Amino acid sequence: MPNAPKRRDVLKYAGATGAAATAFGLPLAQPAAAAEPETFRVRGRAPLDTVVFGDADSEAAHHLDATLSDVVTGGLGQPARVLNPSTPATYWGGTLKFDVTVRPTGTTYVTVRLWGDDHDDTSEEAGSGTNMWRLQLFCEGKQVGYEDQGAVDSLDILDTAPRTPGRFFFHTLPLPERMTAGRNKVTLEIRSMGRIWSYGQDASQLYRTMTTPSRGIYRLYTHTDPYFEAPRGEVQGTAPTATVRTGGEEVMDAIRARVQKDQKNLLTTATPATMDGWAMQSLAEGYLWPGSPAHQDPQAVERVLMAIDGRYMAWQADATVLTGSDQQWQGFGRVGLVLALLWEHLGDRLDGQVTGSPYAIANPGFESGGATPTAWQMPGWATAGGGTWARDTTVRRSGTASLKLQVTSASGYSYVNSAPRTRITPGTYRYGAWIRTDGVTGAGAHIDPLFFDASGKLVGSDHKVYASKGTHDWEYVEFVFATPTGATQLELHLRLSGPGTAWFDDITLVAPTDTTVPVPPPRRDAYVDMLRSSRDYWRRHFPHYSNQAQICAIGLYQTNRGLRLLAPELALPEDRARDYLYQSIGMVPYLGPEDQDGNPTRPLGADYYQVTRAGLTRELGYVGSYGEVIDWLVMMYESVTRGYQGQEAPELRDHMVMMTKARGRFRVVDVDKDHHRISRIETVIGWRNEVYPGETAYASRTAWDSNPVMSAAVFKDPEIVGWTQEMVADGQLYPQLNLQATHPWTRVGLNALRFLSRDWDGFQSLAARPARIPTAWDQPDFVLTDEQNGCVAVKNGEELFFASLYFRSRQGVNNYARIHHVTPVDQRSATIREHSAGTTDSTFTARDWVLWDYAINDPGASHLPPGGFPPPGDTLHQALAGDVYRLAPVPDDVPDPTLGVHFDGVETMLVGRAPFYLCEYGDYLIAMNTSTDRTCVLPARLDFGPARDLVTGKMIGAGKRPRLGPLSTLVLYRGDAG
């Protein structure tokens, strides 16, 4: 593939390049395609141009051409324009086209002014809003940047939470230098568009129709300094006074009700064979929790094992149950975990056969179930008959229950069928049932097997066999029939047509005598097969993205733990099993998938760590929500410590606490839509699927597997406990629990159960701690630098400064930095130009793509075209196409930074992170050395002037040229230099 970075093309950082950097200081490499090198500028230059939308004079002066647009009065009484949906509605909405002044040399920036209270109110915060519209910038008819997850991104992405309540905020993007070179004016365009679902598997799933007006667009500025400073006199707004949120306690009652309902359903009604891993674990946890109806109920243990049986049978029929199920990279890990939790309560159950043979009718005696029996259902179309069905424990032929059907009207009926379908083979089968009746008239009670082919098509029906009418005791009815041609599966229907009551029990299915039906193995053997196969498969497919690696490592440890109980001779030694955990969280180098002999392949060399020295995950750089892996850390820790023969793991806990605390430096404390104090995840500088503002988070956040108090309850670290107690004091606990109360997914049900049964009580028992979120204005200043992720977090008085110097740089060094600057008054987000050095002579050329600037690094994603599916409508072209990015050097022992995935433009490891960065934004200058073996010397900074080193507090003169050793960063601030 042309211009795609491959291992043989990536030169090593050594020799003359390194010597030049060491001897002569950090070169100021010009940005890709820039007309001339940048020089450092003095902060405070006025904008080149300002367009005031909704102001007739300004719009006329800039030759505004508006389509599908209205002028509105918006925040603080300021004029703005909204862009309306088209008729009929499509992905694209209204547009604003206008002329602006630019600089003919260097980089011209565009900044848009937006009102911070605007948000999509169609969903709860952090939910999937339907009106999360976007604004995209175009220059001279070409799209500037990418519609989703590009370094140069959309002009705006609306979220379900307001970004800066009561104030305006600013977003800055660079115009391509080639489009402004030699020109004083260009034509820009803002196009509105619908929502994008980044995980869509085709264009219709990706691109959603815009159906309501966009947010208000207030002003657009052009300027030459990366830091935008609004002209004096512009109305900005002030931060609302933060208050404490009150109320919301009723969500706790909703969670209690939900958990009780879930537990009762799992114990009595749900079909065990079709339970997923979360349901399986939920029932096991319920058996151990005194608050559950399943507590110490032997039926719960049996149903958990039946769920494992069902997973085993499903895997025997479909190998992807292991390799591509809803458990993803965890494989059959929960099977091992559940066995460890229940080990002392299993008795001799593991000696029995696996239940749920696909060749047998499940629950033939209706022994399992609650109000209705498991593995039986009334089809939706049958509800029109007006009849009822129930599991009756007062009438039975044998065992403890039967199926009761009842009809009251002459034309009524009640039909029930077995589910799932039962496999059959050619030959003559005997189908039977015992039926008892009371006052039955009309057609009466009967059985009726329905036959289907492998695709689910009905190929045989109307084989009714009736019991006697009237009132009588148990009567056996039987149907002997040769399997219809093409039939491979059946549903056995039990029916009552006409008034009366009928009971069914002891359903029989007898296969032909000359048919060999597979006999299920003993549970112990089946479970060993499951656990060993899962462990060994995922050892050979240990993924490289950090969150995937963590999930996989959890599964590897859990399956091995199950083997340690079932077949100790097949289990890996504890230190070997725990090593996967260590690799996944950066305690030791990540060694990658293993070969058939168990030898690590080291695809990223011998010294790649999944978590940085600063405690952040790598995907490839800093990520916001994706980096909040505390739920996986807790799951990993408890996979070792809970259950039979659980072990202490202080080394894991200490490292996980460090990682959790690192995330605490990436928080923004502000107010929510109701002006209540809140802490949010820093997402502006993140690489993947970010929303602005970030989700609520103090220590732990709410997610599918996470609740807000879990890390405090489990780790009990004083700082983490203090942050979590701060969340409760702010009144922000209850709003985060709506997910656990309302979402029906079994995964969330397990989350709700752990919150109610363990985390909430455990958290409440902890002593009060004084620690508070580090980024609050009343907390001490700090500087966190992460050279491996190329990012910094700074608290400097009443300023927060977040920067990603290695930002969405997927195939080469793009020389874009991402900035988020926060004060009590305003917020700025920006993609700006920066300088880098130490790159190789190999290059990657940006493609003419508009959705993504990359291809997904996953061999299973070949159905997704590189760059993503084009949006609907006319063909668009990328203004950045043709930009040339130099590749960073990679270590000698990395055989292929694409990891064997050679799609055009594939996201590639390591080649986008430059050895050296120099970035200026406002009063901040960052010099970062990401190399492991080189020292660089900073150039003189006469235009920037003297500045304070925010780590040491020392002043550094403009002419001083400090040296930066390997993996070190200098953060200079000139705002108080005199």
Write out the residue ranges for each language-model feature:
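N-terminal export signals
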Residues: P2-N3, D9-Q30
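Extracellular carbohydrate-recognition regions
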Residues: P37-V71, D225, G233, G356-A384, ...
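Short carbohydrate-recognition loop motifs
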Residues: L68-W92, A390-S411
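Extended polysaccharide-engagement surfaces of secreted carbohydrate-active enzymes
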Residues: K97, Y644-P946
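A short beta-strand element within beta-rich, extracytoplasmic domains
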Residues: V102-G127, G427-T437
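Extracellular carbohydrate recognition and processing domains
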Residues: V144-E177, K457-G486
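Extracellular polysaccharide-recognition and catalytic grooves
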Residues: M313-H345, Q353-T355, P522-R772, F782, ...
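Extracellular and organelle-lumenal recognition/adhesion modules and their flexible linkers in secreted
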Residues: G356-P518
